[in-house]
Regions:
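Beta-strand-turn-beta hairpins that frame and shape the catalytic cleft
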Residues: 1-3, 126-133
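N-terminal active-site segment of His-dependent metallophosphoesterases
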Residues: 1-70
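Active-site neighborhood of phospho(di)ester-bond hydrolases with catalytic His/Asp-centered motifs
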Residues: 4-6, 34-40, 80-85, 134-137, ...
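Short amphipathic alpha-helical segments
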Residues: 17, 49-50, 93-95, 147, ...
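A general structural motif
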Residues: 30-33, 76-78, 130, 157-158
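Active-site neighborhood of divalent metal-dependent phosphoester bond hydrolases
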Residues: 44-124
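Short acidic-hydrophobic surface loop/beta-edge motif
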Residues: 124-130, 173-176
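Conserved beta-sheet core of the metallophosphoesterase superfamily
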Residues: 138-197
Length: 197
């Protein structure tokens, strides 16, 4: 069994929901082969462009938020994670404001998030599993219709797609045919979010 963890966006995560996810993983440990976070593990609020020149940029909580992630990742027994728009904020912020830090290993996302120490595999291009690919969901345009962002990514990649990003849960097929005969069906699955709002 593969467990997909939706966007946590720590510190905005729903603590009860995350606790229930941790319990589920513990209860089914023997059956689970992978636990994959779908990106946006941290919100990186202080690094966001909307926070620039506002009090949000000066909260000095990023280290604490990262430490919360480490604890949650351990409890969830995360094995893999993929890139996402919120986790991109670290490199983007450094590139825009402090480019001299770009070659500092501690500020590279996998190291900052503690992935090597947690034995978590980092997949910056998404994670391919058989005829599925796990993507964050921001790789192309988004749709307001649940499941449709993932379905469009399925059409684009030619693979079944599971994604986060849009904060909706949905499962939508994309079926092709020729001469009245079905040739294939691809699935787009959006996994929702784990935020407390």
């Amino acid at each position: 069994m593969i467990v997909l963890i939706p966007d946590l966006q720590i510190p905005l995560h729903d603590k009860q929901f995350v606790s229930a996810l941790c319990q589920f993983v513990a209860d089914h440990k023997k059956r689970i082969t992978r636990v994959v976070t779908m990106g946006d593990e941290l919100d990186f609020t202080s690094m966001g462009r909307w926070s620039e020149s506002t009090p949000l940029a000066y909260t000095r909580q990023l280290g604490n938020e990262r430490n919360q992630w480490v604890k949650i990742a351990e409890d969830l027994q995360v094995t893999d994670t993929i890139r996402s728009n919120h986790t991109d904020r670290l490199a983007t912020g450094i590139m825009r404001r402090l480019p001299g830090l770009l070659d500092v290993p501690e500020f590279e996302l996998p190291n900052f998030m503690g992935l090597p120490e947690l034995d978590i595999n980092w997949h910056p291009q998404g994670l391919r599993l058989a005829d599925w690919i796990l993507l964050h969901g921001d790789e192309s345009g988004t749709s307001q219709i649940a499941g449709t962002t993932a379905r469009r990514l399925a059409e684009k990649t030619g693979l079944n797609v599971a994604c986060g990003h849009v904060h909706r849960a949905g499962l939508v097929p994309h079926t092709t045919s020729i001469n009245g005969k079905l040739t294939r069906t691809l699935w787009g699955m959006e996994v929702g979010h784990a935020m407390d709002y």
